[in-house]
């Protein structure tokens, strides 16, 4: 420590002496004047070192510690920020994967529902066709029955007409009486 102080003192003296040498010439007493200035300067340096040495040293030591602490805290903050960034990026990747999974699932469900709707529509189509076929068969049967009934009525009318033309009123009365007897016989 003392070696550093001596070195600093010597540098200051050399700087001061070169500054004094650059001045204009004075008459007489040059060495005394120079020695007095050097002694004054040495006393000033001694007082500064004696009274302000420790506070200045402490100030710079504290400043150094503060800077080192700030650097450490900055590095820690940077590491935490990088870690947080990595976590966020990982979460985003997971979210992207989740979104893709949801889209894939929705697409699969949509395809399944489409297939199910097509199958149900095919079943409904077959059911409607079967119902239509049954209705057509029923309508055809009803039409046939109606035609048979009408044909029977026409046949009866034609038969009746032919019978009326061929049968005399006495024969009609006789047939009527026989029919009444047959009907009465069935009732009993």
Curated annotation (Swiss-Prot):
- What Pfam families does the database record attribute to this sequence? ATP-synt_B (PF00430)
The record's subunit annotation is: F-type ATPases have 2 components, F(1) - the catalytic core - and F(0) - the membrane proton channel. F(1) has five subunits: alpha(3), beta(3), gamma(1), delta(1), epsilon(1). F(0) has three main subunits: a(1), b(2) and c(10-14). The alpha and beta chains form an alternating ring which encloses part of the gamma chain. F(1) is attached to F(0) by a central stalk formed by the gamma and epsilon chains, while a peripheral stalk is formed by the delta and b chains.
Q: Which organism is it from?
A: Thermodesulfovibrio yellowstonii (strain ATCC 51303 / DSM 11347 / YP87)
Keyword annotations of the record: ATP synthesis, Cell inner membrane, Cell membrane, CF(0), Hydrogen ion transport, Ion transport, Membrane, Transmembrane, Transmembrane helix, Transport
Regarding protein family, the annotation reads:
Belongs to the ATPase B chain family.
Report the transmembrane regions from the record. Answer: 5-25
> Which Gene Ontology terms cover its molecular function?
proton-transporting ATP synthase activity, rotational mechanism
Top-level taxon of origin: Bacteria
Q: Where in the cell is it found?
A: Cell inner membrane
Q: What is its main location?
A: membrane
Record-level GO cellular component terms: plasma membrane; proton-transporting ATP synthase complex
| Known role | F(1)F(0) ATP synthase produces ATP from ADP in the presence of a proton or sodium gradient. F-type ATPases consist of two structural domains, F(1) containing the extramembraneous catalytic core and F(0) containing the membrane proton channel, linked together by a central stalk and a peripheral stalk. During catalysis, ATP synthesis in the catalytic domain of F(1) is coupled via a rotary mechanism of the central stalk subunits to proton translocation. Component of the F(0) channel, it forms part of the peripheral stalk, linking F(1) to F(0).
Write the protein's name: ATP synthase subunit b
Topology relative to the membrane: Single-pass membrane protein
